[in-house]
């Protein structure tokens, strides 16, 4: 990663993820939307169980990326999230509840085929996320990325 700090991943996400959300809103099939609904319901049911919530949350976002219909984007979004997860950030149950609400709003935009709204939702979410992590974890955000800390499957390095 050539000494790239974790904050650079959030910068990349802010550029890339709104476009992915817009593509998902444009290209999602009814089957993909049904899959997103299932992952959202699972995340909502698992808010108090962080590992189970994390699995459903990750599956939802992988589903959004898959809904673009572009296999590169379908791989890129989970990879960016795996890099972010290498920071070891564990959201509280209250924050997980907020995330489910945002996932629900995004799903509505995708279902409506509203690419601009889907992009705006993700841009706002990424911006808030970056501000929160930078304020709460400045040392982690400045720390260079290391492959040894990245897990694509969400099970940890």
Describe the residue ranges of each PLM region:
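All-alpha effector-binding/dimerization core of bacterial HTH-type transcriptional repressors
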Residues: 1-63, 101-124
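Conserved catalytic core of Hanks-type protein kinase domains
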Residues: 15, 67, 79
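Phosphate/oxyanion-binding loops and surfaces in catalytic or ligand/nucleic-acid-binding neighborhoods
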Residues: 23, 67-70, 83, 128
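Cytosolic histidine kinase catalytic core of two-component systems
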Residues: 31, 71-72
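C-terminal all-alpha effector/ligand-binding and dimerization domain
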Residues: 40, 44, 55, 79-157
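Short loop-to-helix capping motifs
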Residues: 69-71, 113-114
